[in-house]
């Protein structure tokens, strides 16, 4: 009987492990790994969609390949900001070259990894938006830079410090349509003073956060609204602090919430997202 109970428990544990693995597979089926250099080959070997940051714009205003390993076929292409000291730029010419490169490599989409909302970037993105739409190639643009575009899919960071992640995503879907909202899974690890005058705290490394937890003996909690963990502590001067952070379990929970909102594409940096590609405890 003891042996039967042991075998029974073993089967239950095995079943739970399989269920967890299948659940993570469901939530990661639309996960796109963002890579540079040699990481691209490693990520592609996992059988996941890959975005390769491999294109830029030269000071002379031409589309150029960055100094990375060979561009992989069937990967999404990533193009970075143009240099601020650019001499001349024909947005339409660069857009046409981008369409050519996407077709040449059979890329399923293009990600404009633009960080600055400048007049030049707005002209470039408008040209990309029309050219890629006409070519039936999806264009992904960070929300802050692409909100005025007509066709691009807007990528929204999950690193929020207030409100509700699902309500935030749902509100944007209501404005732009669900098909035009994607997400960028951006881990957060920040220390805020209370009350906090800004939505951004002081960035903490994982090691610094672990040391702070050990030093203060604080108890972490999970916020369902932010879909992140947090703890509070008092510093030596009696100032209250609030630490908000992600780990593999909260990133997996974010994927689940995004899937529940109907988000079709979620980008995540590799190898930072490697922990999502295995079952969570």
Regions found by a protein language model. Name each.
Residues 117-215:
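Substrate-binding surface in catalytic domains of secreted glycosidases
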Residues 264-281:
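Acidic/aromatic/glycine-rich contiguous surface patches that form carbohydrate-binding/processing clefts
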Residues 1, 9-24:
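Short, Lys/Arg-enriched N-terminal segments with co-localized hydrophobic residues
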Residues 67-69, 74-76, 85-90, 182, ...:
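Mobile, glycine- and charge-enriched loop segments
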Residues 26-160:
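Chitinase-like catalytic core of GlcNAc-active glycosidases
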Residues 257, 261-264:
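Conserved, well-ordered alpha-helix/loop/beta-strand core segments that scaffold catalytic motifs
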Residues 186-253:
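Glycan-binding loop/region signatures in secreted carbohydrate-active enzymes
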């Amino acid at each position: 009987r003891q042996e039967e109970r042991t075998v029974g428990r073993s089967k239950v544990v095995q079943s739970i492990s399989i269920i967890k693995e299948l659940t993570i597979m469901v939530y990661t089926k639309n996960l796109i790994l963002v890579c540079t250099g040699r990481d691209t080959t490693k990520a592609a070997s996992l059988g996941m969609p890959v975005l390769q940051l491999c294109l830029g714009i030269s000071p002379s205003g031409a589309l150029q390949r960055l100094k990375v390993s060979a561009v992989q076929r069937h990967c999404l292409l990533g193009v970075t900001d143009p240099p601020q000291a650019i001499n001349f730029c024909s947005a339409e010419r660069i857009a046409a070259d981008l369409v050519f490169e996407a077709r040449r490599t059979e890329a399923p989409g293009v990600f404009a990894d633009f960080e600055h909302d400048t007049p030049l970037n707005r002209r470039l993105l408008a040209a990309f938006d029309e050219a890629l739409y006409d070519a039936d190639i999806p264009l992904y643009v960070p929300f802050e830079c692409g909100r005025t575009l007509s066709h691009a899919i807007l990528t929204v960071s999950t690193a929020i410090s207030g409100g509700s992640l699902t309500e935030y995503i749902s509100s944007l879907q209501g404005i732009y349509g669900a098909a035009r909202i994607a997400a960028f899974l951006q881990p957060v690890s920040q220390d805020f003073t209370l009350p906090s005058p800004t939505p951004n705290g002081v960035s903490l490394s994982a090691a610094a956060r672990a040391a702070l937890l050990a030093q203060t003996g604080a108890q972490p909690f999970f916020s369902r609204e932010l879909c992140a963990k947090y703890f509070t502590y008092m510093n030596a001067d009696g100032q209250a602090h609030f630490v908000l952070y992600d780990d593999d379990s909260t990133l997996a929970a974010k994927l689940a919430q995004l899937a529940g909102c109907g988000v079709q594409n979620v980008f995540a940096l590799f190898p930072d997202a490697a922990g999502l590609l295995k079952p969570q405890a």
